Amino acid sequence: TFDAKNYTAGPTDVLPVTMLDFSDSDAGKTWVGDIKQGATCNLTINGNNLPDDWYYDNDWFQKEEDGTYTFKAITGRYTVQADFTHKSFRIWTMNGNEPMALNADGTGAIWIIGNEGINKPTWNAVNHGWWTGTDSDVCLTPIKDKVYQVTLTIGKQLRATDVNFKFFGQADWGIEFKGKDH
């Protein structure tokens, strides 16, 4: 827009900001909704900016200089769940109201299920092995159609002395990725 009286111009489009506010209550720990790839997100705890000691997953979000976060995954429906004990978030893709599974054409979701030597934000945050479900498994970030990303660091998300995991097509037993010798 242009103001002819004051010779000032304004933005032609105002980009929406996705507000993800969490509180330490049963109802306040989980956000479910649609997010567009590249969307600007405000991650807040009780209405305040995300504290520096909270872990945000670089596979899902990129922190910007202004304190907002850019959503890196493809456009879709997601669950973002705050873990106040470990000051972090668990994030997974959704199909309606259910966790997303891998589709026959390669779209959907890929999950990691493993022993207590792997998890996010740290390998010992969810310290029980081979359990299934969104509280235990790691959903890979879909960054493009049929392209998934996960970043794991030895000593943080991977225990250096004992790591054992597999890729699955759902947050449960079922579709399992296997090598040629299996």
What does each of the following model-derived ranges do?
Residues 1-182:
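Insoluble glucan recognition modules
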